Amino acid sequence: MGVPALFRWLSNKYPKIISPVIEEQPYEVNGEQIPVDTTRPNPNGEELDNLYLDMNGIVHPCTHPEGKPPPANEQEMMLEIFNYTDRVVNMVRPRKLLMIAVDGVAPRAKMNQQRARRFRSAQEAKEADEKKEEFRKQFLKKSKGDQEIHEEVIQKTWDSNVITPGTPFMDILAASLRYWIAYKLNTDPAWEKLKIIISDATVPGEGEHKIMEFVRSQRAAPEHDPNTRHVIYGLDADLIMLGLATHEPHFRVLREDVFFQESKARTCHLCGQAGHKAEECRGQAKEKNGQFDEKGKGTSLKPFIWLNVSILREYLAVELYVPHQPFPFDLERALDDWVFMCFFVGNDFLPHLPSLDIRENGIDTLIAIWRDNIPVMGGYLTKDGHVEFKKAQLILQGLAKQEDAIFRRRRQVEEKKLANEKRRKEEAQARDRARKRRRSSPNYEPSEPPASNRARGGGGDSAPPNDVELIIPGRGELSRENRELTHSMVVNRGAVYRANMANKSAAAILKSKLMKGSQEGDDTAESTPMPDADGASDSKIEPTSPSVLGKRKAEEPEGETDTPADNTDSTPKPSKDDEMPPDTVRLWEEGYADRYYEQKFGVDPQDKEFRHKVARAYAEGLAWVLLYYFQGCPSWNWYYPYHYAPFAADFVDIGDMELSFEKGTPFKPFEQLMGVLPASSNHAIPEVFHDLMQDPESEIIDFYPEDFAVDLNGKKFAWQGVILLPFIDEKRLLAAMEKKYPLLSDDERHRNTVGREVLLLSDGHPLYQDLVANFYSKKQGAPKYTLNMRVSEGLAGRVERNETYIPHSSLVSSLEEYGMPTLEDDRSLTVNYEIPKSNHIHKSMLLRGVKFPPPALDNADIQATRSKAQHSGRSFGGAPFRGGHGNRGGRINYASDRPNPFAAHLDPNFMPPSNAGAQGMPSGWAPPVPGSANFSRGPPPPPRGNHRNHYGSGHAQQQGYQQTNYGRNDYYGRGQQGHQHQGSYGNQSGQYSGRQSGYGGAEYRGGGYQRGGYQGQGQGRDYYNSRNQGGYGRY
């Protein structure tokens, strides 16, 4: 899930990170379909090594798709999953490895969110079924028992909650994936050299984090290729941040193009047809293909897009570079800080801070505060997945100063938006009333229905009936009968129109609604993504159906939600969308913090210590999330124990926090099922546990409320609200379940065990013979075989014999009736795979020998990004930047005659670092010759566009550390030109002016960081690319 709307925000702010996927399609020759030859070079221009599939992003849309009927049964669902996966593999064409990761048991911190979503999904499915039954009864009463419709609408909504570890469905999915992979290894030549790792739902951990654990383990191997090309597919927005967290520069995220869905939905507003804009409309009627347009174009395949993490790194390198920061710029550490700041705006484990919203550019606000505080912090916020809270305290204090202004501005925007919506509705209602008055007039002359009505079935056909005589100029007069008929129609046209409107069949309307209700019910599954502001899914399982508070579908016209009666009042009624409950917290008014804690937490508004307690728990959560992204799960049992987040102003003295997490153990699959599923989904849980969920006398019956509150929390729709469910008491749950375990069947016990990853490969892979000789020869080798990375083509780890696999046995299919055959001789190999564990933490650094792709940003992109970085995120205050022609990028001058907002945070004994380089420079000193030992060391200048030496490209140590001395942060930039920056310190306190013969030609002002700034006296030269940045002069 990650940050809602992050994908749209990133693609709008950094447009070059998105590029379309070039996908070859099968073609027909003499009526025979010829598949794509994926052994040929990749049409996207680059060969890719490893493909990782976050499989839940495939399972959910295949089992309950949008825009078409769902599969009839689980067998058809498996076929849909096979076809979708095959399409993704064919477009990426990985040459070395495919990893399929299904969500297993999640950490406790994630289970709270899963519980809320599954309870909401079950409630919506129940409401959809109730609506179907109500419509069915109405229709049968009107239509006198149309059996066809009766059978069509009585089908219950498929419960997507079964896509949870431990259910029979997930057991079927795991077995089906193993069969399909083995089938492809036996039949597809493109898979011959491919290694496939399957981590199914029996292996604990979320799919994307199991993938990240694998990537980190391979990076730690001595023979790992630092230029491995990675692609990860999934619907979660946090895959972007996980890609950055790997510090693998050759990384792409693959996903469906949600913007294509929007462009497809947009039609010409004049004629209602797709394919052209209003200014291109010629008013032509829609051409039907077939008598009823049944041969029209079907649903087209959704295109895919790349999100290029390497280009995102380029953008962030420009945006996060702060001129004259008092320590060397380190892009990898800066990227970690950026990922950490994204957590404040939203993640799967913590509610976002009230003052931060991605749609209000909350990340930009944090970046601006971060840039302003870099000189004060003296270093980065994070290091290798650990937060330095003393520095984080400064960021939160900077945000706290802007909170009041943010809330007031948000209210102003909302009021303006509501006023505009009200005005548009009133104008539309006025037009409708005028139209009705015209139609009620006896002289009303209806015009030809617009093409949009014809396209939607609301008007006439594009061709007249065969028995009506056409009026064609030049062919003479009409017959007498038709002439009299035409005269009568013209004279009585108003009455004819009103009669036709009144004679519409109520049964037909009900039938239409029944069909629509059936489709809506199918879309209530939890993981059909609810489009957020970016058109993308902000979670795997956001619903698309009307919410529990009655969210109206976008395509459902207002005023048509009920079958019209003869005596329907034409007076417009206010829609449900206008009936929002009042926001009693009123964040835009004085005293909002007291009201917030009193209403949301139920505590005394004067209890300040409680606020600090919530803030410390939230800070602990931030530390947990960062470790989870960079090092793996730090604790399986930790969770944030509140439904709401604190304000930034409540983070007091968090710099003194000392955190330690107890690792713990993950839940068993049935324990997670009991922790996240509602009682209405008990069909997915073994029957022995049903009483615990349904019996009023059950010791944990309070965990399964039938009704629960949804706090809109200032939002408009229930899917945006906060689900107020009681948190699970782990000790009570496990104690109650322990009594039932002896009653489980053998099959149920098998589903409740912890599984292992499996590795599959074909007999054409070089590793095949080694493994067969070790495990299946007469002279067997060690039970655990350590892979030789040269033979395995880059795969590190250990493997063991899989007890269920028999070499060259038959590959049995359970889908033979669907065209998936049983193979008599299975030539693939299956072994258990163990991801290698490292004794060292994952370092935020580039690996030795990495080679960067050519820069994607040109000089215009860099200048635009730098300009935005200097001014964005400052809508609500904050330290300003100097503007003007001669002051580009200059910092504000905190001298003796100006207050320094950072002074309150400084140690009274703080002294700026000495500059030994300035003291040893003789008069007339010149910079070293390019290529000499001390040339171009220290922080690099901002990137210079498409220059061939951009960020030191072409040298083995680009953007990286000196490998033998991690932490020193020395950069080797021999590829860069030496841009001299000659600057003499002025006499004014705390600033210097300079002439530049090199980069930028801009004047920089000094950034003194004690209360009165520093005084730079005397002469000195500041050489931008020297090891030390000029001199501070005499303090």
From Swiss-Prot:
InterPro entries referenced in this protein's UniProt entry, alphabetically: 5_3_exoribonuclease (IPR027073), Xrn1_helical (IPR041412), Xrn1_N (IPR004859), Xrn2/3/4 (IPR017151), Znf_CCHC (IPR001878)
Start-end of Basic and acidic residues biased regions: 417-432
Keyword entries, A-Z: Coiled coil, Exonuclease, Hydrolase, Metal-binding, mRNA processing, Nuclease, Nucleus, rRNA processing, Transcription, Transcription regulation, Transcription termination, Zinc, Zinc-finger
Location (main, coarse): nucleus
Enzyme class, spelled out: hydrolase
Keyword Nucleotide-binding carried by entry: no
GO CC field: nucleus
Cellular localization per UniProt: Nucleus
Biased composition (Gly residues): 880-889, 997-1019
Biased composition (Low complexity): 972-996
Stretches with biased composition (Polar residues): 564-573, 955-967
Coiled-coil ranges (or none): 406-434
Gene Ontology terms, MF aspect: 5'-3' RNA exonuclease activity; RNA binding; zinc ion binding
Zinc finger (CCHC-type): 266-283
The EC number(s) this enzyme carries: 3.1.13.-
Swiss-Prot/TrEMBL GO biological process terms: DNA-templated transcription termination; mRNA processing; nuclear-transcribed mRNA catabolic process; positive regulation of chromosome segregation; rapid tRNA decay; rRNA processing
Region: Disordered, residue numbers: 417-470, 515-583, 865-1035
Entry-linked PROSITE patterns: ZF_CCHC
Function, in words: Possesses 5'->3' exoribonuclease activity. Required for the processing of nuclear mRNA and rRNA precursors. May promote the termination of transcription by RNA polymerase II. Essential for vegetative cell growth and chromosome segregation.
Family designation: Belongs to the 5'-3' exonuclease family. XRN2/RAT1 subfamily.
Quaternary structure, from the entry: Interacts with RAI1; the interaction is direct, stabilizes RAT1 protein structure and may stimulate its exoribonuclease activity. The interaction also stimulates RAI1 pyrophosphohydrolase activity, probably by recruiting it to mRNA substrates.
Name of the protein in question: 5'-3' exoribonuclease 2
Species for this entry: Aspergillus oryzae (strain ATCC 42149 / RIB 40)
High-level lineage: Eukaryota, Fungi, Dikarya, Ascomycota, Pezizomycotina
Gene encoding the protein: rat1
